[in-house]
């Protein structure tokens, strides 16, 4: 049985003070959650948020990292810096990183490998654009992203990582994939993992849905067999809304 995982990607929102307030408000609301709870604030908020969640059931993730240990990469953060802070998870390959910052399946793969070297659990994002879905090449696109993004890993590593399926056309647009579409596509992603690493591994991998997840949509989504959680954007910025999703 896979334990559900619900993660909030705060993107470029919340000052340090606001981030601490949000977590403070969230803690009592989700203390009895039956799923794993993760918040992913900006880098500058990580130390304060990590301090605030101590002793609670909330884990902390970063929104990105570089694949090099150190060096002349102005504005970037190395995995060992996150590890030293006590960060648990790291989002890798989010569609916004792919769209605006030239993230590729190859850099995703380098980051995934490096995350494991530093005891970070990657939340690996994949997803298709509206054009790709309408062109009926969703499966081809996802297969390419997974086969490159997750190549050359050990079975133990693959079992630990989290995959987030985020149909790009449903992010921040208010559009969502139907529950059937999401379930079917996530099932396909699991098949790709099975082809690469075997059925036992594929059965253990947790795959989230991330596309305009709201308190009103989560229950039906989580009732689907293949969906193991959610990567939540805008709705994770309000404690009440995020708690409603976590306590689905």
From Swiss-Prot:
Active site feature? 94, 166
Q: Where does substrate bind?
A: 9-11, 172, 212, 233-234
Q: Which family does it belong to?
A: Belongs to the triosephosphate isomerase family.
Q: Where in the cell is it found?
A: Cytoplasm
Per the record, the GO terms for biological process are: gluconeogenesis; glyceraldehyde-3-phosphate biosynthetic process; glycerol catabolic process; glycolytic process
**Which Pfam family, an example, fits this chain?**
TIM
NCBIfam families xrefs = tim
Q: What is this protein called?
A: Triosephosphate isomerase
Key words, A-Z: Cytoplasm, Gluconeogenesis, Glycolysis, Isomerase
**Which gene name belongs to this protein?**
tpiA
Could you read off the lineage of the organism from its UniProt record? Bacteria, Bacillati, Bacillota, Clostridia, Eubacteriales
Subunit comment: Homodimer.
| InterPro entries named in the record | Aldolase_TIM (IPR013785), TIM_sf (IPR035990), TrioseP_Isoase_bac/euk (IPR022896), Triosephosphate_isomerase (IPR000652), Triosephosphate_isomerase_AS (IPR020861)
């Amino acid at each position: 049985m896979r334990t559900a995982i619900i993660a909030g990607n705060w993107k470029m929102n919340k000052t340090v003070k606001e981030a601490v307030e949000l977590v403070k408000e969230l803690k009592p609301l989700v203390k009895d959650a039956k799923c794993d709870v993760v918040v992913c604030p900006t880098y500058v908020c990580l130390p304060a948020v990590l301090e605030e969640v101590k002793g609670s059931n909330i884990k902390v993730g970063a929104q990105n990292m570089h694949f090099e240990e150190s060096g002349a990469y102005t504005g970037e953060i190395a995995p060992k810096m996150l590890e030293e802070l006590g960060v648990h998870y790291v989002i890798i390959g989010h569609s916004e990183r792919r769209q605006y910052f030239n993230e590729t399946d190859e850099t995703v793969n380098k980051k995934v490998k490096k995350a494991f070297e530093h005891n970070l659990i990657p939340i690996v994002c994949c997803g298709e654009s509206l054009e790709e879905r309408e062109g009926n090449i969703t499966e081809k696109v996802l297969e390419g992203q997974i086969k490159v993004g997750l190549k050359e890993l050990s079975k133990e590593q693959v079992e630990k990582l989290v995959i987030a399926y985020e149909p790009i056309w449903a992010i921040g647009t208010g559009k969502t994939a139907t529950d059937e579409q999401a379930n079917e596509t996530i099932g396909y992603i699991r098949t790709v993992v099975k082809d690469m690493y075997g059925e036992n591994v594929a059965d253990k991998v947790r795959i989230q849905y991330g596309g305009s997840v709201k308190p009103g949509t989560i229950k039906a989504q989580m009732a689907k067999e293949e969906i193991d959680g959610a990567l939540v954007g805008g709705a994770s910025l309000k404690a009440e809304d995020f708690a409603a999703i976590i306590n689905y």
